[in-house]
């Protein structure tokens, strides 16, 4: 049985936003306070995140998540990526590296923005002092396994940057975001 927790579903600035507040949303409705995009899943014994929003620390605290095996990135916009540094806390708790999966284009952006977080496999690093994220690039439409989890990355169309969707275990769970066409 899969477990899926939506950590955030708000737009890039979150809801309420600094500029527009709640907009058309009712501020009295608790569900209208929305953190930025993020999803946690447990599938086939794998604990994974989709994206790391700037709200990641609070998302993990509020959902009592203290272990992550892998992170799958949809794209390299700040609202989906810039909480990546908070993964150091997971490294400290578990004492091990986290696998990071992204398209070659998005992985290149991550390496450029956050070089201090990337550790090549086999490199000896103490995760208490430094994050340990192992980079893994994939090809679209080519399935691969991470442990017992089958992953098929798909390229989404219509966003202003390359965006990835994921099919897990032949459709047991599918995650897509920020797209206009598939």
Cite the ranges covered by each PLM segment.
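Binuclear metal-dependent hydrolase catalytic cores
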Residues: 1-174, 180-182
């Amino acid at each position: 049985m899969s477990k899926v927790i939506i950590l955030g579903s708000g737009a890039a600035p979150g809801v309420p936003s600094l500029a527009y507040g709640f907009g058309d949303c009712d501020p009295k409705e608790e569900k209208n306070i929305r953190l930025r995009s993020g999803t946690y899943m447990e599938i086939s014994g794998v604990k994974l995140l989709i994206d790391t929003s700037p709200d990641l620390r609070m998302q993990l605290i509020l959902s009592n998540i203290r272990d992550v095996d892998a992170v799958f990135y949809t794209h390299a916009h700040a609202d989906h990526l810039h909480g990546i540094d908070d993964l150091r806390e997971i490294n400290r708790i578990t004492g091990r590296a986290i696998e990071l999966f992204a398209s070659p284009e998005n992985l290149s952006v991550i390496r450029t923005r956050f070089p201090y977080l990337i550790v090549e496999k086999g490199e000896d690093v103490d995760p208490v002092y430094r994050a340990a994220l192992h980079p893994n690039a994939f090809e679209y439409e080519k399935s691969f396994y991470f442990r017992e989890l089958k992953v098929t990355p798909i390229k989404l169309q219509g966003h202003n940057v390359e965006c990835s969707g994921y099919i897990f275990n032949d459709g047991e769970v599918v995650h897509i975001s920020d797209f206009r066409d598939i």
